[in-house]
Amino acid sequence: MSVPGEREQGAGEDPATVRPTQRTLVIIPTYNERENLPLIVGRVHHACPQVHILVVDDGSPDGTGALADELALADPDRVHVMHRTSKAGLGAAYLAGFDWGLRRGYSVLVEMDADGSHAPEELSRLLDAVDAGADLAIGSRYVPGGTVRNWPWRRLVLSKTANTYSRFLLGVGIHDITAGYRAYRREVLEKIDLSAVDSKGYCFQIDLTWRAINNGFSVVEVPITFTERELGVSKMSGSNIREAMFKVAEWGIRGRLDRARGVVR
């Protein structure tokens, strides 16, 4: 029986040299992404044919879930679908995907947007960083070599302000802590108490990064090009921003108190 996501090994291959990223699951949450989903799935497998994909659909009324089923039927070994009955937020979708992937033995779990803003052609950069020893590889817009395309200046200012705000309050050195294109070793997700993570929106990324750092895992930023979606509608909302502001402030205060008491979360 083959291990999920693992390429066939030659008879003379030393198991000690098998890379963790040979067992990779790319998790793609969807809500009304019917136009984008076939394109992104095709691009992922063109760039990295060995990886598996899990589409986590939150009951999209536009038929995204049914389309995902068609893609899985056409490629049952590499494409899988999880159907959820309601839109419970980005964080909840990823947590469900992590649980699914960990229970099936994947060694590396990747977060990727369905709208094309995270280029599948750059996925190998994240996987190479994990193979080189990173516990969490973040696709960063704000390190040398990283860039953003086609964003309104207000979105860019908001993003950079959120990252500066988070770095200051949490005391971490990550330039793009809000980034949603990232690859985790399974050990990170197993060590973090995922049942305690209740972030629903985009601050989910800040939450998990902060927890990974506090648990002693290595975090590496890899430059990527982030491109604003061309099809569909952005899911960013005022409630996402408010959640991030209040939670980051809470975590920052709690983190200082925890460090004073020697507590690790």
From Swiss-Prot:
Region of interest: Disordered: 1-21
One cellular-component annotation, GO: membrane
GO MF annotation, one: dolichyl-phosphate beta-D-mannosyltransferase activity
Deletion consequences: Essential it cannot be deleted. In depletion experiments increasing amounts of phosphatidyl-myo-inositol (PI) and decreasing amounts of acylated PI mannosides (AcPIM), as well as decreased synthesis of lipomannan (LM) but not lipoarabinomannan (LAM) are observed.
Catalytic activity line of the entry: a di-trans,poly-cis-dolichyl phosphate + GDP-alpha-D-mannose = a di-trans,poly-cis-dolichyl beta-D-mannosyl phosphate + GDP
Keywords: Cytoplasm, Glycosyltransferase, Transferase
Biased composition (Basic and acidic residues): 1-10
GO biological process terms held by the UniProt record: glycolipid biosynthetic process
InterPro entries reported for this sequence: DPM1-like, Glyco_trans_2-like, Nucleotide-diphossugar_trans
Any Pfam family matching the protein: Glycos_transf_2
EC number: 2.4.1.-, 2.4.1.83
Subcellular location: Cytoplasm
Enzyme class: transferase
Function statement: Transfers mannose from GDP-mannose to lipid acceptors to form polyprenol monophosphomannose (PPM); catalytic activity in vitro is enhanced by Lnt (AC A0QZ13). PMM is an alkai-stable sugar donor which adds mannose-phosphate residues to triacylated-PIM2, eventually leading to generation of the cell wall glycolipid lipoglycan modulins lipoarabinomannan (LAM) and lipomannan (LM).
Miscellaneous note of the record: In a number of other Mycobacteria, including M.bovis and M.tuberculosis, this protein is the first domain in a 2 domain protein.
Quaternary structure and interacting proteins, as annotated: Interacts with Lnt (also called Ppm2, AC A0QZ13) upon coexpression in E.coli, which increases the PPM synthase activity of this protein.
Annotated family: Belongs to the glycosyltransferase 2 family.
Protein's UniProt name: Polyprenol monophosphomannose synthase
Gene this chain is encoded by: ppm1
